[in-house]
Amino acid sequence: MGCTLSAEDKAAVERSKMIDRNLREDGEKAAREVKLLLLGAGESGKSTIVKQMKIIHEAGYSEEECKQYKAVVYSNTIQSIIAIIRAMGRLKIDFGDSARADDARQLFVLAGAAEEGFMTAELAGVIKRLWKDSGVQACFNRSREYQLNDSAAYYLNDLDRIAQSNYIPTQQDVLRTRVKTTGIVETHFTFKDLHFKMFDVGGQRSERKKWIHCFEGVTAIIFCVALSDYDLVLAEDEEMNRMHESMKLFDSICNNKWFTDTSIILFLNKKDLFEEKIKKSPLTICYPEYTGSNTYEEAAAYIQCQFEDLNKRKDTKEIYTHFTCATDTKNVQFVFDAVTDVIIKNNLKDCGLF
């Protein structure tokens, strides 16, 4: 009797092969779909990372889109100088030149127009004179004692350019804008044959209850920490040190049962601001037990250890840490390339393809 397969057997073998092939294709497709959740406390740089994805992996911001940010740039600039002027009263700092008190009064009268996307020559002149004042600069140097936008100096130092009537914000200007994220912002892009869905959620305490339904099927979490927050308090709770709040949040995410199999990528962000700040503001403000030097390398490494030590599953879970400057496109491009390689490796492993 021969070993020839009957037609039914042949069909069954073909069907089996097809099922295997489909399963493999489904597995590969699943391995190519990446759901990334961006988490972190308020103002840690999450939204800036999303903007960088648009610049790096899409066509960036068109001239039309940049124009739409003009009102935000003006609003951020005005709010920054107003925050400094208000803090001067609280910190009992006088203007270097008493004539600036009139400019400060004018500022409050003229501020409304800039919120609408217009910067008059009169308003630009008022802001410029105020920003040059020695008392204003003294107050700016004490900005850890009040809430001030990170981009304050960036915009105020460039007032001549941004006050031009034909001003169109650059990609860097757009990156520097600050708008509080409310709700969830979803971004899609393709990179290294992977289809990314990135979710940016508001970091302020009031926004966190909206995270929960994003948790399912997450490939990786990018958790952003602002290194430069070590000597600041929260906007929503002036008793709470921002770095301690970040650590509390990271602890709850890193050791959450939802994320047992989720890659956790830690972005220690704003390294440029931290490098400047650590020279004059000691790390002991945040970590009284710290005995190291106030050099960037040693202080940054200490903060890294503080976060990584919160991981209660060190034997099975690795934290992938990167030092970042979210406003630096080249740095973000380099880091995201490394992050993607980790995701590819872990994804293939999960799908049994590695």
UniProtKB/Swiss-Prot annotation:
SMART domains: G_alpha. This is Guanine nucleotide-binding protein G(i) subunit alpha-1. One of its GO terms (cellular component) is centrosome. Residues 324-329 are annotated as: G5 motif. Residues 265-272 are annotated as: G4 motif. It is an enzyme of class 3 (hydrolase). It comes from Cavia porcellus. A lipid is attached at C3 (S-palmitoyl cysteine). A lipid is attached at G2 (N-myristoyl glycine). It is a peripheral membrane protein; Lipid-anchor. Residues 173-181 are annotated as: G2 motif. Belongs to the G-alpha family. G(i/o/t/z) subfamily. GTP binds at residues 43-48, 150-151, 175-178, 200-204, 269-272, 326. Its EC number is 3.6.5.-. Residues 32-354 form the G-alpha domain.
